[in-house]
Structure formats: C-alpha cells, structure tokens
C-alpha cells in the first residue's frame, strides 16, 4: 500500500472537502480549489478527517493513490495557510518595483521587463531586491516564481540575476591570464 496515499488528512477549522463529479472541491478561509479524482480512487470524509481508498491494486491506481493524496493535501494547506515563494535579485542596477498589479524589473537589458501576475497570485516587492510570490495554488505559485526567475537566471561567474531565496549558486572560476 502507498505510504503517502494511506496517510489521513486532518482538516483544519473552516476547511470543507466535497466531491463533485470527477473533482474534489476544497473550500477554506482563503478561497477554494479543485483537484481531480482519478479513476479507481475514492474519497471518504468523517469527523474532519479525509481518507483516500483505492478500488484495486493495479499499478496505475497504486501510483495515482499517493499523487491524489498529495494534491489534496496541497489544496487543504493552500486554502487554510496559503503558499509563498521568495526571490532575490543580485546585480548592480538590477531592481524590481510594482506598477499597479504589474511587476516591473530592470535587469540589465535596454528595456524594462514587465510581468503581469495571473489571477489568484499576489506579488510583493520589498527593498527593490526581494520579490515575494504568494497564493493558494501551490503549482501556480511555483510556476509564477519560475517564470520571474527565467527573465534573468543567475549566471555562474558573479551570481548576477534572479534566484530563489534558499537557492545556492555554485560559482565558476574566471579565466586565468596568460603568463
């Protein structure tokens, strides 16, 4: 049996889980999310505890058992606490600022880079060098952070660019001159 799939999910206060056709609807204080229920997986809710059970031991169903539980847990945490990713900008003259709902970045190009946040994502800028991406959907928060990072990924010689706050950049040695 899947170790992840058989683990129970304890629902926090004010979080509801309902099954609607082939989806699970998770509603909480921060909003609501939907996650798919794969064929062969059933969801049971009792006394604030959600259990996932599978109908048979096919390899595909066994694989999807843990996945469904992980996706459901991400939804529960998202609607109760939310998700966030922090980015840092390193480099002389590199900076970010908010202009309305857009993120405007100066990253050493001849033009400013403008990033429009998708619906459900909040972007905050602190000290012009730190960007915080937050929202209730873990996948969308991670994708937005990756999109922002891809505008100027850190380079390996000086580390200039946009990196995740917890990311370590392995630096290369520069050229050695001819003697």
Swiss-Prot record:
GO molecular function: rRNA binding; structural constituent of ribosome
Domain of life (superkingdom): Bacteria
InterPro entries: Ribosomal_uL6-like, Ribosomal_uL6-like_a/b-dom_sf, Ribosomal_uL6_a/b-dom, Ribosomal_uL6_bac-type, Ribosomal_uL6_CS
UniProt keyword Protein transport present: no
SUPFAM superfamilies for this protein: Ribosomal protein L6 (SSF56053)
GO cellular component terms, A-Z: cytosolic large ribosomal subunit
Listed Pfam families: Ribosomal_L6 (PF00347)
Keyword RNA-binding: yes
Keywords: Ribonucleoprotein, Ribosomal protein, RNA-binding, rRNA-binding
GO biological process per UniProt: cytoplasmic translation
HAMAP family given in the database record: Ribosomal_uL6_B
Subunit structure: Part of the 50S ribosomal subunit.
Sequence similarity: Belongs to the universal ribosomal protein uL6 family.
Annotated function: This protein binds to the 23S rRNA, and is important in its secondary structure. It is located near the subunit interface in the base of the L7/L12 stalk, and near the tRNA binding site of the peptidyltransferase center.
Protein name, UniProt field: Large ribosomal subunit protein uL6
Protein source organism: Leptospira interrogans serogroup Icterohaemorrhagiae serovar Lai (strain 56601)
């Amino acid at each position: 049996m899947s170790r992840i799939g058989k683990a129970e999910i304890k629902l926090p206060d004010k979080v509801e889980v309902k099954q609607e056709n082939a989806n699970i609807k998770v509603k909480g204080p921060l909003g609501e999310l939907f996650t798919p229920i794969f064929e062969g997986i059933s969801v049971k809710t009792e006394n604030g505890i959600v259990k996932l059970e599978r109908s048979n031991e096919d390899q595909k169903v066994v694989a999807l058992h843990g996945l469904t539980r992980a996706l459901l847990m991400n939804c529960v945490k998202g609607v109760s606490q939310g998700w966030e990713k922090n980015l840092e900008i390193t480099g002389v003259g590199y900076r970010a600022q908010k202009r309305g709902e857009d993120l405007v970045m100066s990253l050493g190009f001849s033009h400013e880079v403008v990033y429009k946040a998708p619906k459900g994502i909040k972007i905050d800028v602190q000290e012009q060098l730190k960007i915080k991406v937050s929202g209730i959907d873990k996948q969308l928060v991670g994708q937005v952070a990756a999109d922002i990072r891809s505008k100027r990924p850190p380079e390996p010689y000086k580390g200039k660019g946009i990196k995740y706050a917890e990311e370590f950049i392995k630096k290369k040695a520069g050229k050695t001159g001819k003697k």
